[in-house]
């Protein structure tokens, strides 16, 4: 059974653990807790946050890995701090792994990024980008009650989604270019966590992505992030935008992609519900919400429901097979 921490003790390693604990005064609490609970029999995965637990639980299960302890570190920086605490002459890199988001590390220096044979990075910005993929779109339709559509209808919905997602990514390059410039220039406070896609983008009744003008987007992004608009350099932002264009499918911030995905899925469900095309059978996860006419998907559904539906990532399966699976085979 997969679990998030446990309370098992292994007396055979406690003496060694006590020595390690006594020598580490500034280690993250997560790491010291790990040492106190460590056993040689278990495998461990350090992740950034609670949302990662839901996603990686499902991915591990799809890899036929039935037992691994997932440890939440509360942020990428703390995952790295935990990694740096380990003496790898004492622990196996096949037993202990670290799962982090790639973020923008392919484009700019990320002080919290790190690499090793036991470090897995998402192939896109974050796990949200993976969940909001065309591969998971059909699963989402099922969760919304689209049971009886023909293959041709499903393919049409997927095609329409990809067209709108492409429009979204093209436009969001402006926002990402601004963020990249802020990061590379160390502009503060640059609170881009405050940027809400809904402030400048919405899904129309006929399920199309609609944006405000570039100038309006720029003003809203700078205001929300508490950055002086005088810092805006049109030429440099344009250059960055051109440089990152080919990577647009992988670098749009995950939280922004979530916003598009939820709104778009809600829009098509409402539209088809009004045409009586949804089969709201009892086992439809969200059927009761649909019937009440409320928003069909919320952020909690995004992780709780859609994470579990996401297909297995081949790159993740390969990572698991060459790390924790190897450790378990050797131990058995």
Question: How would you describe each model-predicted region?
Answer:
Residues 2-332:
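Acidic, divalent-metal-binding catalytic cores of TOPRIM
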């Amino acid at each position: 059974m997969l679990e998030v921490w446990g309370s098992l003790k292994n007396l055979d390693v406690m003496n060694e653990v006590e020595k390690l604990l006594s020598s580490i005064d500034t280690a993250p609490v997560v790491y010291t807790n790990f040492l106190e609970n460590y056993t040689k029999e278990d495998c461990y995965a350090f992740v950034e946050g609670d949302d990662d637990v839901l996603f990686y639980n499902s991915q591990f299960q799809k890899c036929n890995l039935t037992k691994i302890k997932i440890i939440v570190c509360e942020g990428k920086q703390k995952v790295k701090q935990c990694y740096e605490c380990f003496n790898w002459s004492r622990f196996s890199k096949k037993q202990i792994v670290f799962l982090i988001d790639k973020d923008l590390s392919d484009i700019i220096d990320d002080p919290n990024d790190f690499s090793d044979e036991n470090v897995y990075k998402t192939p896109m910005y974050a796990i949200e980008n993976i969940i909001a993929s065309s591969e998971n779109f059909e699963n989402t339709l099922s969760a919304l009650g689209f049971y009886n559509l023909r293959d041709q209808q499903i393919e049409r919905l997927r095609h329409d989604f990809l067209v709108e997602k492409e429009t979204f990514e093209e436009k969001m390059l402006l926002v990402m270019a601004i963020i990249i410039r802020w990061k590379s220039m160390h502009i503060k406070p640059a609170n881009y966590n405050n940027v809400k896609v809904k402030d400048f983008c919405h899904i129309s009744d006929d399920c199309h992505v609609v944006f405000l003008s570039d100038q309006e987007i720029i003003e809203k992004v700078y205001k929300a992030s508490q950055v002086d608009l005088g810092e805006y350099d049109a030429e440099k932002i344009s250059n960055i935008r051109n440089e990152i264009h080919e990577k647009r499918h992988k670098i749009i911030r995950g939280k922004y992609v979530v916003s598009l995905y939820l709104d778009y899925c809600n829009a098509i469900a409402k539209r088809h519900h009004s045409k009586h095309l949804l089969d709201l059978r009892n086992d439809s996860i969200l059927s009761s919400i649909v019937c009440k006419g409320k928003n069909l998907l919320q952020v909690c559904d995004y992780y709780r429901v859609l994470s579990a539906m996401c297909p297995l990532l081949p790159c993740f399966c390969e990572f698991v097979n060459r790390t924790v699976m190897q450790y378990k085979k050797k131990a058995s």
